[in-house]
Every structure is written in C-alpha cells, then in structure tokens.
Amino acid sequence: MGKEDKAHINVVVIGHVDSGKSTTTGHLIYKCGGIDKRTIEKFEKEAAELGKGSFKYAWVLDKLKAERERGITIDIALWKFETPKYYVTVIDAPGHRDFIKNMITGTSQADCAILIIAAGTGEFEAGISKDGQTREHALLAYTLGVKQLIVAINKMDTTQWSQARFEEIIKETKNFIKKVGYNPATVAFVPISGFNGDNMLEASTNCPWYKGWEKETKAGKSTGKTLLEAIDAIEQPKRPTDKPLRLPLQDVYKIGGIGTVPVGRIETGVLKPGMVVTFAPSNVTTEVKSVEMHHEQLAQGVPGDNVGFNVKNVSVKDIRRGNVAGDSKNDPPVGAASFTAQVIVLNHPGQVGAGYAPVLDCHTAHIACKFAELLEKIDRRTGKAVETSPKFIKSGDAAIVKMIPSKPMCVEAFTDYPPLGRFAVRDMRQTVAVGVIKAVDKTQAVAGKVTKSAAKAAKK
C-alpha cells in the first residue's frame, strides 16, 4: 500500500487520571510517530536533568500538552502515529481542562476510543468505581457516537503479568462497558505495559499464557496480540461526503483585494467553487468563488478539511462564527426556533428545572439557551422514560428537554448531521451537562439576502 493511500482515523484516549494514558500515548507516538529524533533527545536530556528519566514517554506528552496549553500551536504531526494500515491522530487526552467540551464541539469526531485501565491493586477498582472519571468518559464517548472501543489493561508489569488478575479485570471491565452501552464481543482487550513498551508494538514475552485478543463485529472476526494490531483492526469509518453540505464557520476574515473569506471545517458534504451557499441563521445566500486549504486552491473540499472560501458581495457584518454554510439547492441549513434534546447532567451542584438558561456550545456556536420544558426523565442506559414532566433533574440524570435558543442558532438532529447535533452545556466555567439533539423545529426561512452573483449563478 502506497504511503498516500493510507486512511486517516482519529482516536481519543480515555481512562482514570493515573491509568497511564500519557505514558502509553507518548510511547505510541514515540515509537511510530511524528516526533523527530532531535526533539526526543532534547526532551530526554531535560527529563534526565530533572530526574524524570523514568517518565520519558509521559514527559514527551507533557511537553506537547504544555506547549499546547500555552497556545503555542504544536505541529500537529506530533500527535500522529502510523500503523500498517492507518495514519492515526490522537485528538485529545482527558485531563486536559476542556476535554469534555472538546470531545463534543470537538475539532473532530473520534472513530474509536482507547480506554486505558490500570491493573494495579486498588488502582483498577478506583478507576471504575461509581463516581470514577472512567465511567463518565466512557459514557460520553458512547453517547457522542464513538461506536468503536479498545480496552488496554495497562501496568501489567506491576502485577508480574498475572493471568488471574488480567482475567479478573476483563470480567469486571466487560460488565462495566456493557452498562455504558458497548458490546464486549466487539472490543479487543489488550494487556500492556506503557512504561516498558511491552505488548504495544511487539508481542510480549512476559505472558506466555496470553493467546491474544479477538473481537467480532458485523464486518467479521479479527484477532491479534498487540495494541498496535488492535488499532490497526479499527474499522474504517465512512466519511459523510454523500450528505448535504454543512460547514460551521470558525471565523470570517476580510482580506484586502480578495474580500470576505469565511473559514471552517467541512463536517458533511462537499464544497466546490461555483456553488451557491446559504448561511444560517443569517439567511444570506451567495456564490463561492474559490476554496482553499493550507494556501492551496482546491477543486473541492471534503469532510474533515479545514477550508477558507471566498464569497462575493457579502460583508463581514453579514455572517459570523457559529453560522453554518450549506448548499442552497440541497437541504439548506436554517435557524432553529426550538429543539428537543436528550440531556445528561454531569456535574451540577443543584437542581436543574424549567427556566434554566446556560450557554450551549454546539459546533462553533456559543449561545444561551433556555430549558423551556422538561418532557421526561429517562434511564441513561436504555433510553426508556422513567418519569414524565419531572420538576427537576440533578447530576447523573438524563432527560428529554425542549430548548429555546436566546438568539437564532443553527443546529440539526444528531441522526442527520452528528457534528451539529451534540452540544455541551456550560455554566460556572465548566461543562455541567451534555446533550444530543433529537428533533429540530426549524424556523421558516423568510426571504433573506441573496447576492447578485448568487442570483446570476442560480440561473446558469
């Protein structure tokens, strides 16, 4: 397979604070990744000087994280590694303050979650206890549509690679992920030591009892031994090029001599020069003159591409961040008057009732929305109603809620356009709830502004 033919996939690494996420991820990036030797030697030298020699892989990741948090845009290649079949990007590791928010408004949807579980005595139990972060992260991943999962049982060296401990942990973890919603038969369970790099890329010699992992999905059965093989066995996601265009704007620039240039990530569909696009909820329709990515002109942009595109006769005042561009002839986006969503309250100190009006982060929009009506309280696992018209909901509860945005916003049902159908509820500077949109009451598009070039292009 030629280098260019490899598919790109995104993984998110989840697990308890001390499960060894950084060390494990650092190791993969270190061994198969985009970090050049010079950088690594520099990091190793610094780590040794600070007496952190033992943490060198985690140190690599900490350095990257620190630079990222300081707003230094890190060469994103550093967060990539290669398997025989894929280019893999690690989109975020929890522990990062905004992990939950990032996962939802996410720069990209993860195709697979890697759940790292620590095998140490007491560690495992703490990690998946009732109030554990692990449960929350796994639930989030599942709720937000990350349908594939790999479980890595880490720190096996601390248990002397005990088969009994491994089997005990697998039994417990299977129950745990089943409750979250995953089917254990479709999941690879891999014993590793991220610290020693054992069973990560090459089969470990420390566990002669280990016969390998196997999983069975609709696509068939696959088996392997190492974590790398498990990542390689992720099923390639279908990218939604066949859906109508949805492109949430991240920014709108005014560039001298060129004009107005909206910038954003194509979530679904394709964007081509000559297309007539409508921006919602601004309700402005115009023609796309050119599309570019990394300063190169594109014949077309596809899902996942971060593009800038030049539009005719539209001023920077007409459109803004949070607007969504779509094809004016193919299910164009419109604003939402209200919508119903399944909301899961994660950590709110009090009770949430009708009238609560926090800020919603949905794709690039950031808008206050009112909980107009609590329709029913539901069981998080089954989705079945347990109470109609509850007065309040609290942390741990899930409910179907009717929501009304305080000003026009463009959202979609999760089943139609996933990236525009999930949101984070922010209050008190933290994510207090997450939601998945079930249905949208779309405002009837009144005749908006149609530029001359759009009218002309439409006649063609």
Curated annotation (Swiss-Prot):
The modification N6,N6,N6-trimethyllysine is found at residue 80. InterPro entries: EFTu-like_2, G_TR_CS, GTP-eEF1A_C, P-loop_NTPase, T_Tr_GTP-bd_dom, TRAFAC_GTPase_members, Transl_B-barrel_sf, Transl_elong_EF1A/Init_IF2_C. Keywords: Cytoplasm, Elongation factor, GTP-binding, Methylation, Nucleotide-binding, Protein biosynthesis. SUPFAM superfamilies: EF-Tu/eEF-1alpha/eIF2-gamma C-terminal domain, P-loop containing nucleoside triphosphate hydrolases, Translation proteins. GO terms for molecular function: GTP binding; GTPase activity; translation elongation factor activity. Coiled coil: none annotated. Signal peptide: none annotated. This is Elongation factor 1-alpha. Residues 15-22 are annotated as: G1. It is found in: Cytoplasm. It comes from Sordaria macrospora. GTP binds at residues 15-22, 92-96, 154-157. PANTHER family: TRANSLATION FACTOR. The modification N6,N6-dimethyllysine is found at residues 3, 317. Residues 193-195 are annotated as: G5. One of its GO terms (cellular component) is cytoplasm. It comes from the Eukaryota. Residues 71-75 are annotated as: G2. The modification N6-methyllysine is found at residues 3, 31, 317, 391. This protein promotes the GTP-dependent binding of aminoacyl-tRNA to the A-site of ribosomes during protein biosynthesis. Residues 154-157 are annotated as: G4.
